[in-house]
């Protein structure tokens, strides 16, 4: 009788262990969000950063060959930028033509550098509901502004964060392959109007000049 009771207890113990294992295996786990709208590290985009904020100007941000940063009314090779995500919400901005990184000094002044400095050249990208973005220095927390027109007769007005509209950068047009000529109309006066025979083959002496 004692052996039967012992076997029953062991069976009950195994049933409890199996039930616990099955319960753990059947528990639901959250699925990671795979939305393409999230800013993953390594994501690269080519954009023009256009601003029409209250700066008395409408311009595209340019990173120039001499390292200066300014605005251009029209899109130009210097205003085509490469935005690369360093981590969620933080990007680096590179001039495609000049290979200079957009950087910001502690006083807010912008410049283009051939070398990437994580402290000076990393920007937080804040997405607004109207499609515009605001960029802030990750290290200093200063908003990204285009340099304004300096006037000796008035003090610069205080400015809020500048809004930039990222416009898609179109890839350069591919050149047409050489050697492709338009087809010529058939020569109805020839013995070979469709040019199926070489120039020196199958030609009647009657057509020789």
Curated annotation (Swiss-Prot):
Family annotation (InterPro entries): FGF15/19/21, Fibroblast_GF_fam, IL1/FGF
Region described as Disordered: 143-209
Signal peptide segment: 1-28
Gene Ontology terms, MF aspect: fibroblast growth factor receptor binding; growth factor activity
Compartment annotation: Secreted
Keyword annotations: Growth factor, Secreted, Signal
GO biological process: cell-cell signaling; fibroblast growth factor receptor signaling pathway; neurogenesis; positive regulation of cell population proliferation; positive regulation of cold-induced thermogenesis; positive regulation of D-glucose import; positive regulation of ERK1 and ERK2 cascade; positive regulation of MAPK cascade
Chain coiled-coil ranges: none
A GO CC annotation given for this chain: extracellular space
Record-linked Pfam families: FGF
Nucleotide-binding as UniProt keyword: no
Keyword Signal: yes
Parts of the chain that traverse the membrane: none
UniProt similarity note: Belongs to the heparin-binding growth factors family.
Subunit text: Interacts (via C-terminus) with KLB; this interaction is direct. Interacts with FGFR4.
Function: Stimulates glucose uptake in differentiated adipocytes via the induction of glucose transporter SLC2A1/GLUT1 expression (but not SLC2A4/GLUT4 expression). Activity requires the presence of KLB. Regulates systemic glucose homeostasis and insulin sensitivity.
Descriptive protein name: Fibroblast growth factor 21
Taxonomic source organism: Homo sapiens
Lineage: Eukaryota, Metazoa, Chordata, Craniata, Vertebrata
């Amino acid at each position: 009788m004692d052996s039967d009771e012992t076997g029953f207890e062991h069976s009950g113990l195994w049933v409890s262990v199996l039930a616990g294992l099955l319960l753990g295996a059947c528990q639901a786990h959250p699925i990671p969000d795979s939305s393409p709208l999230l800013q993953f590290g390594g994501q690269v985009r080519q954009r023009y950063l256009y601003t029409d904020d209250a700066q008395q100007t409408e311009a595209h941000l340019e990173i120039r060959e001499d390292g200066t940063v300014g605005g251009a009314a029209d899109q130009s090779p210097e205003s085509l930028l490469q935005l690369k995500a360093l981590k969620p919400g933080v990007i680096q901005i590179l001039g495609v033509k000049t290979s200079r990184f957009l950087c910001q000094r502690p006083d807010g002044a912008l410049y283009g550098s051939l070398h990437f400095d994580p402290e000076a050249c990393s920007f937080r990208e804040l997405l607004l509901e109207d499609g515009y973005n605001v960029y802030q220095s990750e290290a200093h927390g200063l908003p990204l502004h285009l340099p304004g027109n300096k006037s000796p007769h008035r003090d610069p007005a205080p400015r809020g964060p500048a809004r930039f509209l990222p416009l898609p950068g179109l890839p350069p047009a591919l050149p047409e392959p050489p050697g492709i000529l338009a087809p010529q109309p058939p020569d109805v006066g020839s013995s070979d109007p469709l040019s199926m025979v070489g120039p020196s083959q199958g030609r009647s002496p009657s057509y020789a000049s």
